[in-house]
Amino acid sequence: MLLTKRFSKLFKLTFIVLILCGLFVITNKYMDENTSVKEYKEYLDRYVQSYSNKYSSSSDAASADDSTPLRDNDEAGNEKLKSFYNNVFNFLMVDSPKGSTAKQYNEACLLKGDIGDRPDHYKDLYKLSAKELSKCLELSPDEVASLTKSHKDYVEHIATLVSPKGTYKGSGIATVGGGKFSLMAFLIIKTLRNMGTTLPVEVLIPPGDEGETEFCNKILPKYNSKCIYVSDILPRETIEKFVFKGYQFKSLALIASSFENLLLLDADNFPIKPLDNIFNEEPYVSTGLVMWPDFWRRTTHPLYYDIAGIAVDKKKRVRNSRDDITPPAVYTKDLKDLSDVPLSDLDGTIPDVSTESGQLMINKTKHLATALLSLFYNVNGPTWYYPIFSQKAAGEGDKETFIAAANFYGLSFYQVRTRTGVEGYHDEDGFHGVAMLQHDFVQDYGRYLNAMESIGNKYGGTKSADAIKFDKNYSLEKYTEEFFDNEDLNAKNHVDVMFIHSNFPKFDPYDLSKSNFLTTNGKPARSYTALKKVKNYDIELENFKVLNEYVCVNKNPFKYLDDLLGQDKTEWKRVCGYITDRLAFLESTHDKAIAGK
């Protein structure tokens, strides 16, 4: 079929060339003397080239062409881009499954709480088997049939598309703004510049939050940053047909951003290492997709693989959670009985552990198909795919959509092995986590290569597969601690923190001032108390410096605060009073915080 299509297009191209050559011979006699033959030949070459481009095709939705970039006021190029994504969204409208899951769970479901990847949860791993996971979210045969058809139709439809030439170029960072998230995005940008990162930043302003003129036109350009909009890639009439919300904006930021190499960040996620060279580092260069882990094991419904048409070999174990290096015979008593083995350890499945998508690195040339399928999962996430992927697990949302899409296409990716860290504070009620700590993927990959070499030497060489036996002394925890996790900052296998995902509370001065959240026994308290973990970067102090300077001293207008406070001088005084008091407290306690006191 593909050969026939190509022959047809070649025939059309040859035919049009013959016609144009004929026109050239005829019109050459009558051409204006001011038009040279060279100029006419150049025009002919351009026309033939444009026709060739128009009818060039690929069965791979992720194919990319090498042509002139289409952004930066290239009106014709932008129209091509809008046409491409208009087709994508038309397919989304036609192919999305109808209705929604009732989110009813079978009484036999054993998922009564989140299952982590620490030793105290190992006793619960049988609950993650295909047999047990299939007893949770209830999906009827008709629903499965409908989901299967819609998934197949969408995949087939986007496979017919060829992205416009130069759709994405360069490298940079994107996040989602709008409302309070624009203010938080600005805090991220200031952190990036504090760290010496010079990569450009794009902030997606959702359709309902447009109008941040001062922020977009005056503040951001000073920091090599700018606002982008859904209307950059979609016609207005298409936008009006969709209701976007929540996690779906991240998928939109991914495709709307102009960068080929993209770091997609949540607006409350602060990079605390220089990032300018991250796109030149392994494993990003070879895979084009790097993700980070969550705290929890994967709980994807087995029926997802049926819906997506993914073959799962239930007789072949290929890993033990994050350990995909040690031979399965070492940690599996009976390779012929995998009935209690976690589903995600089987060949063909999405690997453990679950994904935390507060940061994502993606090459959109290599992984355009991943981006487009994850868009489908996110558009249909609240109705179907979020519960199918997570089944009541914490953080249900877009987090599994990117890795699932890459896994579907068999595209390469790397998920960081180092466990997610936690930062927070203690009070009379116990420990309160305020941030997730995600680690340096380059260092992590170096530890992974060390693990491959060490384990390869132990089990490789002259040993046959039959000679490798079950080892009762094997431990996933030992594997993890030996090669990746070590709280000793000076240990050879220590991996630096790269991102502080400050998920609760967020650095929103209005909410913080209203709740008086960061107090203990009526006194101000620090929420980040282990600064050595983060190379002594005092994130609270630095962010409140920015808030004080831009909100209270310079009075830069942020639409979120302007809409909330308006002309109410009393409210402005209260909010800025909180900011200045908090800043004074953080400055006075900085040295003690660095010392760990």
Swiss-Prot record:
| Subcellular location field | Golgi apparatus membrane
Q: Which InterPro entries does this UniProt record tie to the protein?
A: Alpha_mannosyltransferase, Nucleotide-diphossugar_trans
Annotated TM spans: 13-28
User: Null-mutant phenotype, please?
Assistant: Leads to calcium resistance and vanadate sensitivity.
EC main class here is transferase
According to its UniProt record, what is one Pfam family this protein matches?
Mannosyl_trans3
Parts of the chain on the Extracellular side: 29-597
Write down any Gene Ontology CC term: Golgi membrane
Q: Which residues are glycosylated?
A: 34, 363, 473
| EC number(s) stated in the UniProt entry for this protein | 2.4.1.-
Q: In which pathway does it act?
A: Protein modification; protein glycosylation
Q: Which residues lie on this side of the membrane: Cytoplasmic?
A: 1-12
Q: Which domain of life is it from?
A: Eukaryota
Primary localization: Golgi
Biological process according to GO? mannan biosynthetic process; protein glycosylation; protein mannosylation
Q: Name one GO molecular function term.
A: alpha-1,2-mannosyltransferase activity
Membrane topology reported for the UniProt record? Single-pass type II membrane protein
**Which keywords are on file for this protein?**
Glycoprotein, Golgi apparatus, Membrane, Signal-anchor, Transferase, Transmembrane, Transmembrane helix
Family recorded in the similarity comment: Belongs to the MNN1/MNT family.
Q: What does this protein do?
A: Alpha-1,2-mannosyltransferase, responsible for addition of the first alpha-1,2-linked mannose to form the branches on the mannan backbone of oligosaccharides.
**Description of how the protein assembles with itself and partners:** Interacts with SVP26.
Q: What else is known?
A: Present with 6730 molecules/cell in log phase SD medium.
Supply the name of the protein: Alpha-1,2-mannosyltransferase MNN2
Q: Which organism is it from?
A: Saccharomyces cerevisiae (strain ATCC 204508 / S288c)
- Annotated gene: MNN2
